[in-house]
C-alpha cells in the first residue's frame, strides 16, 4: 500500500496556511525556483539536522512533492538508451519514469543477507559504462533498512569511479529512526556525484500538500529547473510559507509523531507474531517488512 501518514500537520503549520491564504496578494503565479524564504528554510533544515551546508540560491530546488523530482531528474539527465540502476525491491516509480525517458533499466537486488543494501560486487559485473544514473532510497522503502555513513560513502565512491549520478530518495529519515537522521550529502565529495530528494510528506504529515526538495550542485539544479519550468509552476505561496513554518519545528514534534508510530509498530509486531511471520526489529519508515510463513 501507499505510505500515507494519517496524522495532521502541526497546528502552527496549518495556522500559517490559513493566515497567508486570507491575504489578497498571494494568489498569483510563484517563481519556479521557489520562494527565497523557503529555500533558506530548507538550507537551515539541512544544516540543523544533517550538518550539511547548502547554498539556498544555487543548490536547492523546491518541488511539488518529491515524486515529481523523479521525473524531472530522469528527463534532465537520461537520454534514450542510457542505463539506469533501479533497486529490487523498490519504489515502482523509479522504473515507470525510466521507461518514460526511454532509458534501459538495470535492476540491482537488495538482499536480507546483505542488510537490504546494494551488493557492490554484483554492481561491478554490470555494463557500468552504459549507466548514467542510480536510484537509491535510504532509509529504505519497503524493507525499512536504515541508512549509514559507511553505505553513503561507498555509494559516492562508486558513483565517482564510474561517472554515475547517485540519487538518494530520503523521505523517511525522521520516521521510526531513533538515531540522528543522516543524508548522503554528508559523505565527503557527495556534491560532486550525488543528488538527494527530501519531502515534508512523511516527517511533517503533509503528504497532500505536495512539498518536496532536491538538493545538489548548482549545475545539476539548473538542469532540473530547466525541465521543471517547462512542466509546472511554483507552489501556492501560502503552502510555501506553511512549509517554512514546518521546517522550523523541533525535536518535540518528531518525538510526539514517533511515539504514535512506535505504538503502532508494537501492535504490528504482535499481529505478525500471531501469524507466525518473521521480521526484523529496528526498521525505519512507515512500513514493517516481514516474511510470511510457509503455506501462504
Go through each PLM region and give its residues.
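Active-site phosphate-binding strand-loop segment of PLP-dependent enzymes
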Residues: 110-182
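Active-site PLP attachment segment
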Residues: 180, 186-223, 235
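Structural signature of PLP-dependent enzymes
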Residues: 224-231, 246-270
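Short acidic capping loops at alpha-helix termini that bridge into adjacent secondary structure
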Residues: 53-60, 80-83, 130, 191-194
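Conserved PLP-anchoring active-site segment centered on the Schiff-base-forming lysine
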Residues: 76-98
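N-terminal small-domain helix-loop-helix segment of the aminotransferase-like
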Residues: 1-65, 72, 247-249
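Helix C-cap/helix->beta junction micro-motif
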Residues: 101, 161-162, 275
